[in-house]
Amino acid sequence: LFLADRALHVHGFEQCREAVACARSNAKRNKLHNCSFTAGDVAVQAKRAARAGESPDIVIADPPRAGIDPKLIALLLELRAKILVAVSCDPARLARDLARLSEGYQVQHVQPFDFFPRTPHVESVALLVRRG
């Protein structure tokens, strides 16, 4: 939602139906009319959108703890968005996902965030740019 004022259209994919309902409510509350949200398996929904002709300039992936699903990584490589932002709560899984994505993307920057001081938990955000 935070990118909606800079985008022609924002399409959010989310496994959790309650999160989709919250996103729709927040978009409405903030008068964001260029947003749509789809609930269900993210890889399946994103593939369906790609087949319908959606071609994103920017993709933000914020997967569950297990990391980005291999099917979704394959789709991300196929979509070839100019910019990919990968969010992770597990640095090891982020490293694994970035290695897989390196086939089509170059890592520009990785920034850790200590949202939970004095705990071993760290969030990381990686900025990737499409190769070629």
Task: Outline where the language-model segments fall.
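Rossmann-like S-adenosyl-L-methionine
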Residues: 1-132
